[in-house]
Amino acid sequence: MDLTVIVLTCNEERNIRQCLESALPLGAQILVLDEHSTDGTCSIARAMGARVIDVPAGVKGFGPKRRYAVSKSGTDLVLHLDADERLTHELIAELKSILPSLERDSVVAIPRLTYLFGTPIRHCGWYPDRKRRLYDRSHTDFDEKLVHEDVPLPEGSRVVTLTHPLLHYSYPRLEDFWRKQGSYPVLWGRDRASRGKRCMLVSIPFRALFFFIKTYVIRMGFLDGRAGLWLSIANMGYEASKYLSLYEAGREIDAKKRGQDEGRR
């Protein structure tokens, strides 16, 4: 099949085997872009037939990494997976049914079901969480965002939305949640600040409180039980961290700019 499955990794030996095993029935090429793993990630991936390449020193952020991996793909059609994601038999069958007739300008959106401590999260705004992951690289590619990257839709694009979800086992334990969320707020804040976004410090508590209300009440997180309450509280802290990072990154950029302006006088 003229398709490459792309997986980004960094010390993912706990996940990579199951991820690649779930993708093998597609019969696609598999490309793993690894960022200096010190565990068995790369050896496991190679043993399963994947081509493994390293992230170059100058490539930073998730968007640029995905774009670099795409540039090394042996096919125009690419499917992106994270190491903690799994393709189900039903999703494989659905993908196989659409691939033969997929147009070049089509972008495939796949619903994603995330598990938190073993509980599927179907509310909180986390489902169906459709991700644009399958596309022809001659038509589009991931944007350059450092985090929360996405695939833009050029004019004339056709979005094909699948029914069966990708399973996302991102947070089996409490420490996994905090570890994965740790770098995202900083990357998000730097990215937004570099694009000219700013926020007031006094607004941050209100943003965080509103995000809790939106997640737990408006998006019915209470229907996910204790996991929904835990996630809503954690998301409130995550939202505060994002905007604190934006506030600090904006101050640094503005101070540097003022210093440059004064130096020209």
Briefly describe each language-model feature range.
Residues A28, C42-K72:
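Conserved donor nucleotide-binding strand/loop of the catalytic core
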